[in-house]
A protein has these predicted regions:
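A short beta-strand micro-motif
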Residues: 3-8
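Acidic, low-complexity, intrinsically disordered interaction modules
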Residues: 12-54
């Protein structure tokens, strides 16, 4: 299991989908790194995380 991924926004922590399932989170974009597809989400508090697609 990856704990971080490298994105255009820098190295982001990987979190489960349940972590971003509130109204405070906004989907930003999809990307891949080392063959792993993930989505990037941003929170109203400034936190940015990646959610790996399963």
């Amino acid at each position: 299991m990856m704990t971080t991924v490298k994105t255009v926004d820098g190295v982001l922590p990987v979190k489960p989908m349940s972590y971003v399932l509130s109204d405070d989170w906004t989907y930003m974009y999809s990307d891949d790194w080392k063959g792993v597809d993930f989505n990037v989400y941003a929170c109203m508090n400034g936190e940015v995380v990646a959610v790996v697609e399963v």
